[in-house]
Amino acid sequence: MSEIEIGRGKRGRRAYSFDEIAVVPSRRTRDPEDVSVAWQIDAYHFDIPVMGAPMDSVMSPATAIALGRLGGLPVLDLEGLWTRYDDPEPFLDEIAQLDPIRATARMQQIYAEPIRPELVTERLRELRAAGVTVAGALSPKHTQSHWRTVLDAGVDLFVIRGTTVSAEHVGSRAEPLNLKRFIYELDVPVIVGGAATYTAALHLMRTGAAGVLVGFGGGAAHTTRRTLGIHAPMASAIADVAAARRDYLDE
C-alpha cells in the first residue's frame, strides 16, 4: 500500500471511514433463502451478527436479556453504574438531562463509587437466569482485581475492553496484565480489544483470544475523536484486522 509524506521523517497512509466507501455487487448472486447471518465464537452460536456494546448508555441487564433473546451477543459493562449502585436508574436519568459540560463533572462524581463484587455477581446471574449467553466486560486495569468474581458468577464469555488494548502494555505503577498467560489459564473464552491496526490485532490473536474487538475512536458512539482529536477510520481498521486474522490462521 502506498504511503504519503505527512512531514519530514513522518509517513502515513490514507484510511477510510464507512461514509467514504460503498459495497458493490460481485459477479455472482445468491438466493436470499440460502443466506445466513448466523455466527459463532468458540462454542456459542448467535442468530444475528450484533454484539451489544458494554456501555451504560446502551446495555442494561434488561437490554442485555432482550438482545440475547433476539439472537445477539449482549455484553454487560461490569465497571458501569449497574455494578456500583443497587438502582442506577435515577443517576442515568439525571445524566441524560444535563448539558454536556455539567454532565461530565457529574458523571465523574457518580462513577467515583467503587465497584461492588456482589452486584457484579447479581447482574451476571440475572442474565444466566434469563437463559441468554452471559458476557461481561472489564478494562485491563480492573480485570486483575475482579476476574475471579466474574468467573465465579458463571460468565460464558469474558471481555477485556479498553479504548485501545495491546498484548504488550508497559507501565511503571503496577504490574501489567499478562494477556497471554491470563487467557491461557482462564477456563472461558476471552474477547479483547479494541485494536485498529494489523500488528496490534495480530499480537492480540496470538495471545489465544477467541475474538478481537475492532476500533479506536472511529465509531458512531465514540467520543475519543471529539475529545482528543484522534481516531482510526473504521473501514480501514476492519480491513487491517481482517487481514491479520487471515495471516494468523495461516500460521
What are these regions (language model features)?
Residues 1-249:
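Active-site entrance/lid segments in N-terminal catalytic domains of soluble metabolic enzymes
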